[in-house]
UniProtKB/Swiss-Prot annotation:
Membrane-traversing stretches: 5-25, 46-66, 79-99, 114-134, 150-170, 290-310, 343-363, 378-398, 425-445
Native organism: Bos taurus (Bovine)
UniProt-recorded name of the protein: Golgi pH regulator
Family: Belongs to the Golgi pH regulator (TC 1.A.38) family.
Main location: Golgi
Cited InterPro entries: ABA_GPCR_dom (IPR025969), Golgi_pH-regulator_cons_dom (IPR022535), GPHR/GTG (IPR015672)
GO cellular component: Golgi cisterna membrane; Golgi membrane; Golgi-associated vesicle membrane; monoatomic ion channel complex
Complexes and interactors: Homotrimer. Interacts with RABL3; the interaction stabilizes GPR89A.
Keywords: Glycoprotein, Golgi apparatus, Ion channel, Ion transport, Membrane, Protein transport, Transmembrane, Transmembrane helix, Transport, Voltage-gated channel
Locations listed in the record: Golgi apparatus membrane
Reaction(s) catalysed by this chain's protein: iodide(out) = iodide(in); chloride(in) = chloride(out); bromide(in) = bromide(out); fluoride(in) = fluoride(out)
Length: 455
């Protein structure tokens, strides 16, 4: 009876997650597109529902909600379904919609979709060869084979996003990095833009006048005919045509310059708005957050470097370890186990909420940046694939933030994976991503004032 009640709770929550994914799809991703493939919408919503269910089961594990056997059953079922979606269903439909957009392959799209899926499976399987991700006793058809490979892709993605986010967040929030933009700077750039537009207009007028003169002289229509006439037309040109070509090249260069000046002007306006915003209470709050995240970024880079150099992976979750150090230093009586459970629950909850929110915001921006009416179905399925792999990998990494007694069921469900490898791999990719982001933002920040203030 308790199993039925537990299952009804899980099914209800999955229906709610599915509905939220459906609404997000309709009101965010596809609100500007008329053509909707319901199979794409269903796949995206189902992936979102089962991804969120994994996080729900982590919270239930900490709070002790549901029977332990029920939790284990739903862990196993949820994991099998999400892997089925990520490895078999989504890649096949991505190939199907890619082939459907090619007219030459339209009649045999099912065959070519299968070929694309087999190609994906080959590279997906070969991905596991260079990495020590499995225990030697796992068979080739075990579920761990799929989890391990999905984990490598997802952890790599998480580390790349985390590395860039850890650097970009303080850079975006802190007023220290804002350039000092005045109205004089904006007016000077707008004056250059107007001068460029005037030059483009005057040169186009000259081109129109030249064409009119050539037309009146009969240089446009009196073309020689026959073979020798064609040879002559190639080897010789009308007196005004060379001038037209030269002016057209100048116009093209000026139009490119005008586009750059327009973008720089818009950037200066945005920077000026950010300067005004930084003076408000909310702006000062985000500025404080920027300093906090900059300290976190430095600490995270330092710890990732230490972990890589000394091949170190923590065995105790950060909350418990931090409380133990504080209690030992202050010499006070404190129930470490009791409070570490509650603080770990809050920490894991914050990680889950921020991960889901941050990923959805990133997915929305990414979708609007690259999608079109023809490619939108493929892009949504790619986002569903990324989302599922991201959440599966989050479970692998969140495991280390949980007290030891709560890690057991996750270890049992995921199998005997080499969890330490995933943490080391995350540190390596995070460090590369963070340092690359620092270099990129430094060069962009250094070059921006020179570009904007050039005479």
């Amino acid at each position: 009876m308790s199993f039925l009640i537990d299952s009804s709770i899980m099914i209800t929550s999955q229906i709610l997650f599915f509905g939220f994914g459906w609404l997000f799809f309709m009101r965010q991703l596809f609100k500007d597109y008329e053509v909707r493939q319901y199979v794409v919408q269903v796949i995206f919503s189902v992936t979102f529902a089962f991804s969120c269910t994994m996080f729900e089961l982590i919270i239930f594990e900490i709070l002790g909600v549901l029977n332990s056997s029920s939790r284990y059953f739903h862990w196993k079922m949820n994991l099998c379904v999400i892997l089925l979606i990520l490895v078999f269903m989504v890649p096949f439909y991505i190939g199907y919609f890619i082939v459907s957009n090619i007219r030459l392959l339209h009649k045999q799209r099912l065959l070519f979709s299968c070929l694309l899926w087999l190609t994906f499976m080959y590279f997906f399987w070969k991905l596991g060869d260079p990495f020590p991700i499995l225990s030697p006793k796992h068979g080739i058809l075990s579920i761990e084979q799929l989890i391990s490979r999905v984990g490598v892709i997802g952890v790599t993605l998480m580390a790349l996003l985390s590395g860039f986010g850890a650097v970009n967040c303080p850079y975006t929030y802190m007023s220290y990095f804002l350039r000092n933009v005045t109205d004089t700077d904006i007016l000077a750039l707008e004056r250059r833009l107007l001068q460029t537009m005037d030059m483009i207009i005057s040169k186009k007028k000259r081109m129109a006048m030249t064409r009119r003169t050539m037309f009146q002289k009969g240089e446009v229509h009196n073309k020689p005919s026959g073979f020798w006439g064609m040879i002559k037309s190639v080897t010789t040109s009308a007196p005004g045509s060379e001038n037209l070509t030269l002016i057209q090249q100048e116009v093209d260069a000026l139009e490119e310059l005008s586009r750059q000046l327009f973008l720089e002007t818009a950037d200066l306006y945005a920077t000026k708005e950010r300067i005004e915003y930084s003076k408000t209470f909310k702006g000062k709050y985000f500025n404080f957050l920027g300093y906090f995240f900059s300290i976190y970024c430095v600490w995270k880079i330092f710890m990732a470097t230490i972990n890589i150099v000394f091949d170190r992976v923590g065995k105790t979750d950060p909350v418990t370890r931090g409380i133990e150090i504080t209690v030992n230093y202050l010499g006070i009586q404190f129930d470490v186990k009791f409070w570490s459970q509650h603080i770990s629950f809050i920490l894991v909850g914050i990680i889950i909420v921020t991960s889901i929110r941050g990923l959805l915001i990133t997915l929305t921006k990414f979708f609007y940046a690259i999608s079109s009416s023809k490619s939108s179905n493929v892009i949504v399925l790619l986002l569903a694939q990324i989302m599922g792999m991201y959440f599966v990998s989050s479970v692998l990494l969140i495991r280390m933030s949980m007290p030891l007694e709560y890690r057991t069921i996750i270890t049992e469900v995921l199998g005997e994976l080499q969890f330490n490898f995933y943490h080391r791999w995350f540190d390596v990719i995070f460090l590369v991503s963070a340092l690359s982001s620092i270099l990129f933002l430094y060069l962009a920040h250094k070059q921006a004032p020179e570009k904007h203030m050039a005479p």
